């Protein structure tokens, strides 16, 4: 038997319904904040992610589905969504239009990592990217948007924020951090030694416990912030507080990607076992220029849909749609034609077999239908149909010409 690949799962109807509910909520909130949908390819040039995500990241170093296609091109399945959206922004010359552009996306991402609860090799993200707006108010709006999504989904989270500063802040901080790492070179892991050379700040993202113990004494990035970066970070906290959003400052929060500056944030949930990030993002003012575009501000976030699904469990069991059936074989053609007309306006399940009433009712219940419609010999003679609301249990016989009015 051929099965799905390890770390890649089917979404059967109940899970697919939950996925759709989550995405619908995300889209509704994003649109309220002025975001429009963008669709980008699943397959991109590998160079895109090497330049955007960074050579020192685990994604590029260990996790990409990378291969050479039949044309000899070095390509990979997208491991995250931001880089593709930025590429599309540049390719469409929107970086030269001097306008603010807000986009949202959702879909499959791919990383070759060890599958575990809430973490798959093919997984789904919902994300938003804003280009051309450098105000810290936009950073706050992004965070408020994510907070609103989780509120609507009734998911409890902890928000952690940090500032990575601007270019001058980062230069000053890296000098202090490298000095600290050199002093502890014999104690840190090999990955951290590699990161020290490529992008020192990423050592703070190391998951090895012995390294984390060492980094408790590392210099704090917020002590190296320029006046401008410090003012922006203070303003961000002020806006969040004014809007009733609680947060914790985590000076070790650097995200896993190399292109962030100033604001970085994560929403953490402990509802799927150990504390786990369910959404994260921040500002990346250098990324558009890194990828060959005209320098442009950027800020955004992404959230893991599977992790949200783990928290919410199965989709709600709200009844929906119409179940239409006949008690006699002679009337199956009639209900089929009736159902075909109703499908222009309603969700209709048609039973092609004549069965006893109780059997039909059982089938309708199993399919979670809201409205049960049945035609028997007597109803046909009188040009009527038997109607039952399976939610309220109300039932009656109604004239066929009044059916659509009853269905609403």
Swiss-Prot record:
Give the matching Gene3D superfamilies: Anticodon-binding domain, Bira Bifunctional Protein, Domain 2
Q: Name one GO molecular function term.
A: ATP binding
The chemistry this enzyme catalyses reads: tRNA(His) + L-histidine + ATP = L-histidyl-tRNA(His) + AMP + diphosphate + H(+)
- Xref: SUPFAM superfamilies: Class II aaRS ABD-related (SSF52954), Class II aaRS and biotin synthetases (SSF55681)
Q: Which NCBIfam families match?
A: hisS
Q: How does it assemble?
A: Homodimer.
Q: What is this protein called?
A: Histidine--tRNA ligase
This protein's species is Campylobacter concisus (strain 13826)
Gene, per the UniProt record? hisS
């Amino acid at each position: 038997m051929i099965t799905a690949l390890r770390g890649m799962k089917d979404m059967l109807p109940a899970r697919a319904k939950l996925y759709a509910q989550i995405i619908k909520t995300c889209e509704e909130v994003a649109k309220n904040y002025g975001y429009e949908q963008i669709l980008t390819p699943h397959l991109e040039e590998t160079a895109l992610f090497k330049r955007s995500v960074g050579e020192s990241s685990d994604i590029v170093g260990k996790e990409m589905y990378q291969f050479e296609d039949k044309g000899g091109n070095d390509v990979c399945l997208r491991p995250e969504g931001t880089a593709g959206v930025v590429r599309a922004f540049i390719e469409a010359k929107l970086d030269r239009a001097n306008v603010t552009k807000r986009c949202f996306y959702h879909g499959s991402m791919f990383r070759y990592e060890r599958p575990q609860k809430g973490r798959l090799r093919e997984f789904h993200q919902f994300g938003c990217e804003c280009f051309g707006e450098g105000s810290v108010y936009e950073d706050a709006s992004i965070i408020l948007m994510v907070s609103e999504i989780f509120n609507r989904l009734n998911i409890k989270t902890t928000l952690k924020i940090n500032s990575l500063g601007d270019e001058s802040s980062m230069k000053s901080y890296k000098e202090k951090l490298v000095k600290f790492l050199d002093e502890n070179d014999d104690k840190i892991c090999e990955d951290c030694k590699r990161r020290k050379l490529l992008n020192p700040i990423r050592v703070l993202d190391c998951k090895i416990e012995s390294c984390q113990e060492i980094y408790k004494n590392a210099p704090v990035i917020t002590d190296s912030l320029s006046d401008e970066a410090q003012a922006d970070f203070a303003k961000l906290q002020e806006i969040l507080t004014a809007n009733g959003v609680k947060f914790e400052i985590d000076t070790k929060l650097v995200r896993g990607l190399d292109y962030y500056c100033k604001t970085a944030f994560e929403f953490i949930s402990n509802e799927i076992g150990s504390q786990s990030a369910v959404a994260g993002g921040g500002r990346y003012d250098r990324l558009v220029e890194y990828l060959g575009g005209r320098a442009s501000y950027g800020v955004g976030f992404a959230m893991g849909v599977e992790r949200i699904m783990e928290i919410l469990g199965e989709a709600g069991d709200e009844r929906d749609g119409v179940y239409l059936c006949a008690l006699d074989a002679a009337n199956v053609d009639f209900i089929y034609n009736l159902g075909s007309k109703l499908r222009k306006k309603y969700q209709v399940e048609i039973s092609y077999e004549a069965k006893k009433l109780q059997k039909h009712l059982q089938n309708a219940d199993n399919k979670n239908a809201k409205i049960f419609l049945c035609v028997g010999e007597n109803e046909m003679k009188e040009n009527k149909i038997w109607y039952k609301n399976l939610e309220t249990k109300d039932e009656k016989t109604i004239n066929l010409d009044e059916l659509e009015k009853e269905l609403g």
